């Protein structure tokens, strides 16, 4: 329990330190630039990072810990492609909801069937892809095909590694042998808690906007 609490605290503390773009804001011009940017991008926002952690834990108990996260990665890549570089107002609220949903499912303590897990990963992953696509265009500007391919490869590789790696930590280091084990459920609760906080922020912002405040 102490190890889990310490790890969660370190993850929260480390997030700002990790939030530095590999290219220091320089424009992407080559495949390598896109690859580096893709590797660094999930670390720019703790909301994306926490969702990937939840994917890793949920996938762990489907019996397909290595391959189930690919559904999320495929949907995320589709979201990046579909975004067309546009920013959609509904994306950030849906990302908050995605954390609440997937974190809640993990905290529930029951293993998801493979079809349900894949549907959740894909359905929610699209919104993360739309967010990545919008930020890619907004921060990096127009990107060539080679840059975009490199970006998607880097983005997918690092997120797969994070998801699978965290799943291994939960099972092998924290000793979670089932979806109902405390480390797994607490991991889900942590993610759901972040989602709930973000949902409250979204609701607060909407309320202030409706009242003409701020």
Residue map of PLM features:
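Interfacial helix-loop-helix junctions of multi-pass membrane proteins
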Residues: 24-31, 86-94, 133-152, 201-214
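Histidine-/acidic- and/or cysteine-rich, low-complexity loops and terminal segments associated
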Residues: 1-43, 47, 199-214
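Divalent metal-coordination and catalytic microenvironments
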Residues: 19, 45-48, 100, 126-128, ...
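Cytoplasmic-side transmembrane-helix entry/capping segments in multi-pass membrane proteins
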Residues: 66-75, 91-98, 114-126
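Generic transmembrane alpha-helix signature in multi-pass membrane proteins
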Residues: 49-59, 106, 117-125, 131-141
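A small-residue-rich subset of transmembrane alpha-helices
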Residues: 56-92, 142-172, 184
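Residue-level signature of the transmembrane alpha-helical core
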Residues: 35, 39, 73-74, 100, ...
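Final/C-terminal transmembrane alpha-helix of multipass membrane proteins
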Residues: 184-205
């Amino acid at each position: 329990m102490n190890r889990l609490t310490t790890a969660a605290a370190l993850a929260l503390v480390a997030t700002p330190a990790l939030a530095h773009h590999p290219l220091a804001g320089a424009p992407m011009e080559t495949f390598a630039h896109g690859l580096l940017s893709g590797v660094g991008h999930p670390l720019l926002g703790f909301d994306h990072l926490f969702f990937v952690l939840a994917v890793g834990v949920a996938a762990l108990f489907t019996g397909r810990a290595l391959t189930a996260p690919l559904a999320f990665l495929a949907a995320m890549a589709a979201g990046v492609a579909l975004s067309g570089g546009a920013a959609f107002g509904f994306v950030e609220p849906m990302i908050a909801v995605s954390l609440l949903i997937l974190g809640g499912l993990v905290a529930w303590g029951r293993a998801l069937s493979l079809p349900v897990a894949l549907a959740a990963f894909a359905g929610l992953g699209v919104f993360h892809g739309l967010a990545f696509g919008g930020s890619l265009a907004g921060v990096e500007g127009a990107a060539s095909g080679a840059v975009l391919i490199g970006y998607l490869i880097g983005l997918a590789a690092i997120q797969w590694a994070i998801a699978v790696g965290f799943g291994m930590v939960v099972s092998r280091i924290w000793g979670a042998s089932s979806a109902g084990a405390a480390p797994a459920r607490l991991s889900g609760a942590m993610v759901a808690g972040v989602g709930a906080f973000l949902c409250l922020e979204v609701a607060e912002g909407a309320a202030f906007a409706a009242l003409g405040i701020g």
